[in-house]
Amino acid sequence: MSAAADPKLLVVRGLRKRFGAVTALRNVGFSVERGEVTALLGDNGAGKSTTIKAIAGVAPIDEGEILLEGHPVTIRHPSDATALGIQTVYQDLALCDNLGICANLYLGRELVSRPTPFGPRVLRDVEMEAEARRVLKTLRINLPALDTPVASLSGGQRQAVAIARAVLWDSKLVIMDEPTAALGVAQTAEVLRLVRDLAGQGYGVILITHNMQNVFQVADTIAVLRLGETVLEARRADLTPDRVVGAITGTLAIGAAA
């Protein structure tokens, strides 16, 4: 298949989502290419969180269309998204502080042996540790021993563990919700390096952030939501921070933002 005919990794069109009498999404649409980072921006209440929850299966859409690799897909539950290769790294990371790095990578999806007449299933620890090391090496993530409790890790290291867990399961698309929030300068730089490395390895990435400097450092495409609809989608190289801020705040007319 030629590059021109190759479908985009993800396309969302006309997404609508209501919570009772409140319409959270009224017309959301954007796309994500393989090997690229799409920054999803907007002020508080613009619909960013609802959009990623819709794609992740947490808050299924009421109307609209989601296409993955050119094919319409139905995502009604997080397990649907996982089966399609969509993983989300939420802001709280969902890590268990008392468990080690490897245990967190496989949390809820541990590899176990087949049952035998002589005893119960047992964890395949050696296999899990080997695969964990492979993924961490591929992503150039340097961490302490795999049995180190994540409670002892820095904020950047914890974020790295969550990202590694997201790509451990044959993922195609990784959604990141504010991955650099509350991180220091050095830790932020490392997480942004990870974001670009993911794209460089062929993953599609949706990045939610309020940091405009980070956006213009790592994003390939920028999509802006305002009041539940997409008001801007363009290549980062064709935009300026002022134009993006204007779309976010509503001081830039939608026609001018398109």
What are these regions (language model features)?
Residues 2-258:
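Glycine-rich phosphate-binding loops of nucleotide-dependent enzymes
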